[in-house]
Amino acid sequence: MRCYVFPGQGTQKKGMGRSLFGRFPDLRRRADRVLGYPIEELCLENPQRRLSETVYAQPAIYVVNALHWSAAQEDLPPADFLAGHSLGEYSALLAAGAFDFETGLTLVRRRAELMGQVSGGAMAAVVGVSEQIVEETLKQHDATGVVIANYNAPEQFVLSGSHEELARIKPVFEKVEGVRAFVPVRVSGPFHASAMAPAAERFRSVLASVDVGGLRTPVISNVTGRPFGPDAQEVRALLAEQIARPVRWTDGIRYLRDAGVSVFTELGESKVLTSLIDRITTAQEPTPDPRRDLIERIKREILQPEIGDEALGFDEDASFRRLGLNSIIYVRLARRAGTVLGIPVKPDVIFQHRSCAALADYLLTRDDIAQAIARAAPPEAPPAPLREYQDERVTALLHGCANGTLSVDRTIEAIRALA
């Protein structure tokens, strides 16, 4: 499955959207009408360094993200999920059909105005250590006014707090073993922290009058790390809360991975999220678990051929007696285990260790059997080769489907169009 992700504030830069404004002039004109100033000039020229100001940066990023989304609709296959980091969440909701472009831009502009009114704070990124170490360091040095505002990756966090407190703890973190960087984030306030609560409440009243439609594609909420529900009131509530609550980006990406997403494509002027996702997915790779693997092999390769698919859902700690096995079946299971493991296994072994877990535990204590298990572990199957067709266009389409560039439906439609 595929997910498109949209970056948020901090990714703005002079020249953003240069290759796309000319391609989608109608979107530029609509943005100019809502904002009352030329968005293309702001993005390409950055007059008076306005992109460093929240009130200008957020609308600019939203518009440029929308340009990239417009291009993606023409050039890329559809998404199964959408997600955006902080401000980028509005781009994801736009792509999902929650509101139209103008409504989203109006919300973003008002959000930026309210957030820009909160002064006296800043944000800084800590890279290289775990959440526990970050929390312990803050606690040990009485940095009670500094909180984790973004959970960006297992070893990357963004802190929110006052300028003074962040300046005080900077040298502290730089001396912590493992910390690779402590750097300021390009925002104008202590976002996603309790200092933003007044802005969040005022924004809640703005959202109350906005019509939020049903989502055509699931969107991950920054507040929960889970998809928004179908209730429009819930969407409004979470958008308001997001201003003063931490961004749980790591939780959201882990949810998507568990849901089966294997392809993440960042739409915007940054590859920051791509880097974060790589760190999250690398850290999420499961460590080898010989016991778990052996239990699954016992179910799949020894039990299932004898008793059927019931074996796959059978409780690993439940006794084989619950399956109604007789002595003949025990003998057959022993023979099959011997075939699978490549060494003789006596029926008594099965009879005395009458659950998948107990049998696995016993087998792993036997050096000869453990070595046989390692030898017998099935190699990872290579991907099935695609049949080569004489028509190179068909071959290209099939390869695109195989590597995830094209969906199955689009591949079928494209092949039919060639007929």
Kindly give the residue locations of the regions a language model identified.
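Alpha/beta catalytic cores of group-transfer enzymes, especially the acyltransferase/condensing modules
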Residues: 9-11, 33-37, 70, 95-244
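Active-site catalytic pocket residues across diverse enzymes, especially alpha/beta-hydrolases
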Residues: 20, 98-99, 141, 173, ...
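Conserved small-residue
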Residues: 6-8, 31, 65, 88, ...
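FabD-like malonyl-/acyl-CoA
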Residues: 1-136, 181, 185, 263-282, ...
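Flexible, low-complexity linker/boundary loops enriched in proline and small hydrophobic residues
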Residues: 5-7, 202-204, 220-227, 232-253, ...
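Phosphate/ATP-binding catalytic cores across multiple sugar-kinase/actin-like superfamilies
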Residues: 64-75, 242-259
